[in-house]
Amino acid sequence: MTDLTAQDAAWSTRDHLDDPVIGELRNRFGPDAFTVQATRTGIPVVWVKREQLLEVGDFLKKLPKPYVMLFDLHGMDERLRTHRDGLPAADFSVFYHLISIERNRDIMLKVALSENDLRVPTFTKLFPNANWYERETWEMFGIDIEGHPHLTRIMMPQTWEGHPLRKDYPARATEFDPFELTKAKQDLEMEALTFKPEDWGMKRGTDNEDFMFLNLGPNHPSAHGAFRIILQLDGEEIVDCVPDIGYHHRGAEKMGERQSWHSYIPYTDRIEYLGGCVNEMPYVLAVEKLAGITVSDRVNVIRVMLSELFRINSHLLYISTFIQDVGAMTPVFFAFTDRQKIYDLVEAITGFRMHPAWFRIGGVAHDLPRGWDRLLREFLEWMPKRLDSYEKAALRNTILKGRSQGVAAYGAKEALEWGTTGAGLRATGIDFDVRKWRPYSGYENFDFEVPVGGGVSDCYTRVMLKVEELRQSLRILQQCLDNMPEGPFKADHPLTTPPPKERTLQHIETLITHFLQVSWGPVMPAQESFQMVEATKGINSYYLTSDGSTMSYRTRVRTPSFAHLQQIPSAIRGSLVSDLIVYLGSIDFVMSDVDR
């Protein structure tokens, strides 16, 4: 692993023409083979020819200090985009976001496509986790993925017509015909849900016996949401399985094109409904990159404090429900007592509990109330002893350890191939935590450790890492309590939304700006920005494209749970059904995070 302290800040926002990988690409493919796009993403964005895509991807994967993870892959409808100076002509585009762990650097490849020739080769030959991303790209934009092993809808019903993220596709329910569910349509939808093993390359049996095909979900309590897995069983052994997602899809990325930069903030809370302010962080930071806003140290620490409170809140639910899945009920009731204390604190600060929508472009909604420090101090005195009791009473239990140790185990290579992040990746021995490697919101000023496993990620290791992460979050909260800076809770910037209230009472120009920004939304410069954060379940990121409007031209939301569920078949083949239940409990996912 590379010594991170000796590296340049690759995550900072600047033009990446000087990134070493640009020179490596030009040395291999020629100086005129690419168009390098200047953005505010903080990573090099390189347009490549479709015919060279796989060759370039293979080159990056085999470099010294290679790009080993496909972090994200999706598309964009470019037809209505007006600010495209210096970019290749394109009606649509597909982007491929790759990460090099050893370099601590990313690169984004883009392919320009004509409306009359919408096709790209499948990336699954290089990265197996491209499978689901390519299915969604085809589904949302109609871009054909040549050579894909199973190009079918993934978020929408199989009977759905059209490609929802195209600019000519309606965004409001009132633009559709009224919905009617006739008996014939109901029968058609039920038939579309019938699983046919042959469609997935599965055999119905061997020469000696038939396999059983079993639906787990979409309403099974151990599925942790509206989630269906079709199991191919030989007795109790899982021969193969097919995860079926999309039941919770709400069109979050399409909504981003209809809401202002400001009014989209409440939607971010609901992408992963347990994460609260953690989900607001990447979106707000990405918008602030577009606007060129720098917030005060006080805002940074407040944001970190709220994020870590929600991290603890989410981890407590995860740990207790994992224990419940294995067979113990008591820790769940303990956890909800502890989580109530967090909600009391969050409500005192923000006015809300689960979904505060409290971060703002340029700051936070209001300053900390009187008494916040007392509530936080009481929680910090309470929680460490409770954590010890969870570990002593349940997590050291020999039955729990016997059910979870060595189950659904994978190494670093498999984790990187499937885009695994968070505790699942760190359990394999890779200490990739965005708060440490690419610090944001002042995390570089906090003293905390990153828990790392011993080389194999199994169910027990993943849950124990989360316990240690809770302790580290408590350390961070203690530092927030002891070192809360003075200063404004909103930046003095024309695009801070809404501007500080007291200024609106003194300056008519500020009052007019307040009215326009709240009613229509702030106008962001035409640019692209990107921000990833260490969320509760792995790395969450927002990739925003502005066309100089009050609304986002394209809002791409990359969630960790989507990648983690795609990994299920590879990790669970050959195990028992009872092992699958433990594995699902160890992943830490919610379906809103998967389906968006």
Curated annotation (Swiss-Prot):
It catalyses: a quinone + NADH + 5 H(+)(in) = a quinol + NAD(+) + 4 H(+)(out). It comes from the Bacteria. It holds the Pfam family Complex1_49kDa. It is a peripheral membrane protein. Residues 210-596 are annotated as: NADH dehydrogenase I subunit D. Residues 1-186 are annotated as: NADH dehydrogenase I subunit C. Its EC number is 7.1.1.-. The keyword Oxidoreductase does not apply. It is found in: Cell inner membrane. This is NADH-quinone oxidoreductase subunit C/D. The lineage of its organism: Bacteria, Pseudomonadati, Pseudomonadota, Gammaproteobacteria, Enterobacterales.
